């Protein structure tokens, strides 16, 4: 009987460990494609990414996506007319489906002085091609890019009105103070020669395990979460360095941000800790704990390295948004202590370009004030007003209620 009990305990312990293991959200490669050599370059890059994927699977991790980020859009299509560029990008989009990777063409505007014509091309890309993702940079160490902000608002308005079910806006974000080589889309970008890769986790379940155990104990939760995240980040670091050594590619680092998705909910984890609904008092404290733990992970970090709170990608978060337990101002407040920003925010269809300018400006102002990477993925929905329900038909978006703008 004792032997049977011991076996049961061991099996339960193994199961608990397995449940606590995060998924690898992305292994992202960074490439500088030639217009005549891109197919061979992508094939070579996928060999590297698939090697890393195999290493993770051998270690017991599920890898969700392989991704490729190209040089910035204007450099990718240099010398092409809009028609030629669209045809080229359509081939890239089709190749991504065939080969099983997600494509990102980087920022259409990096500086305010950049030619805004690239933004017009991106409007067409996001409105007509199903998979390519992209971004703009609205703030960096040099300050806030006000012209880029305004052109970004115009782009988002256009894509919302011209893409099927307005879902093209899901593939675009504006970043502020985010450095190159982030593995997470849509804000990922690079400006170098390529042949690099980075890793990002989906680890909200790890946070949930710790916050359930250390409920309302901030010190214990910070220490235990740091230790748990470190365990998995070191696996990524070891795999990254091994693959780099074997392939000649450079390993850029890991983003330990515990990204949520669907039922793997960061909102649920935070509620486990606070004992109250997401958005209640204590939510900001929980956000600070998560960010402190992430920042303390002793590996080569890249990207946001903080906390993601995507309103419509997290099932419980979408529900709490519908209940109005938090809003845009709440998310901006949380962004003061973590890398939140405004992610997958549904907006009424009649939102003006000037209103979006102000929202992007707030995110850029907060990012530059505190020197932290933030992003804003705004999703206006034509013919929808405050109080209406969104009706996206996307497996990664959970429909919710549209808030009035303040």
Task: Explain the meaning of each model-derived region.
Residues 4-13:
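Sec-dependent N-terminal signal peptides
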Residues 14-18:
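Sec/Tat signal peptide C-region and signal peptidase I cleavage site
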Residues 19-406:
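Anaerobic metallocofactor- and corrinoid-dependent redox/one-carbon enzyme cores
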């Amino acid at each position: 009987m004792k032997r049977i009990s011991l076996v049961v305990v061991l099996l339960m312990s193994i199961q608990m460990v397995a449940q606590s293991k995060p998924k690898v959200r992305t292994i992202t490669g960074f490439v500088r494609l030639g217009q005549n050599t891109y197919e061979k370059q992508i094939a070579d890059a996928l060999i590297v990414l698939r090697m890393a994927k195999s290493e993770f699977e051998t270690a017991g991790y599920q890898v969700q996506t392989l991704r490729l980020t190209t040089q910035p859009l204007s450099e990718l299509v240099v010398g092409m007319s809009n028609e030629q560029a669209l045809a080229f990008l359509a081939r890239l989009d089709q190749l991504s489906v065939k080969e099983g990777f997600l494509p990102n063409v980087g920022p259409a505007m990096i500086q305010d002085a950049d030619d805004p014509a690239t933004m017009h091309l991106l409007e067409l890309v996001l409105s007509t091609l199903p998979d390519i993702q992209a971004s703009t940079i609205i703030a960096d160490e040099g300050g806030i890019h006000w012209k880029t902000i305004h052109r970004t608002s115009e782009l988002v308005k256009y894509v919302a009105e011209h893409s099927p079910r307005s879902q093209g806006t899901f593939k675009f974000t504006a970043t502020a103070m985010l450095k190159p080589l982030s593995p997470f889309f849509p804000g990922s970008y690079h400006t170098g020669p390529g042949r690099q890769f980075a890793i990002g986790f989906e680890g909200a379940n790890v946070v949930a395990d710790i916050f359930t155990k250390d409920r309302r104990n901030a010190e214990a939760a910070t220490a235990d979460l740091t230790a748990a995240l470190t365990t998995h980040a070191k696996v990524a670091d070891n795999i990254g360095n091994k693959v780099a050594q074997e392939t000649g590619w450079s390993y850029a680092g890991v983003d330990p941000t515990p990204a949520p998705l669907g039922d793997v909910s960061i909102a649920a984890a935070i509620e486990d800790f606070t004992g109250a609904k997401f958005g209640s008092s204590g939510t900001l404290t929980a956000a600070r704990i998560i960010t402190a733990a992430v920042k303390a992970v002793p590996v080569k970090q890249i990207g946001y390295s903080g906390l993601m709170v995507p309103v419509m990608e997290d099932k419980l978060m979408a529900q709490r948004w519908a209940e109005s337990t938090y809003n845009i101002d709440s998310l901006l407040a949380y962004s003061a202590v973590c890398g939140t920003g405004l992610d997958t925010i549904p907006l009424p269809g009649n939102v003006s370009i000037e209103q979006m300018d102000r929202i992007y400006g707030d995110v850029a102002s907060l990012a530059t004030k505190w020197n932290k990477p933030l992003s804003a993925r705004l999703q206006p929905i034509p013919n929808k007003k405050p109080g209406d329900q969104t009706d996206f038909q996307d497996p990664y978006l959970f429909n919710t209620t549209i808030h009035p703008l303040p």
